[in-house]
Amino acid sequence: MSVKQTVQVGDKIIRRKATLVHDVSNSEIQTTIRDLVDSMRHDNLVGMAAPQIGRKWRIFVSEVRKTTYRKNIAEPDLLRVFINPRITWKSKKSQSGYEGCGSVAAAQLFGVVKRAESVICNALGKD
């Protein structure tokens, strides 16, 4: 297990455009994926992007599951890895809900965020 410290808002890497991944099998990419999963789970998050652990790559992971702050998850989602993600469609209908962010020092700080109700995202997987 390799838990990385979460980069906080204000660090330049959070705002910088991430780099496309050209070789998914590259050992640095595979290590980044493992570190993201370990860090996300350790910090009780349901998603995390590579820049949040100081890596420049266009990679994020998600796993909706019970956490310290999400206790009422009826059906946990599978772990998903997205490499070079690109949203190709989003619904016109939106929904709002409370979200937190691991890159905000106050982990218990949540705010209402409005998002599309559904999206289609094209991405590579970890394999």
Where are these regions (language model features)?
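Positively charged
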Residues: M1-D127
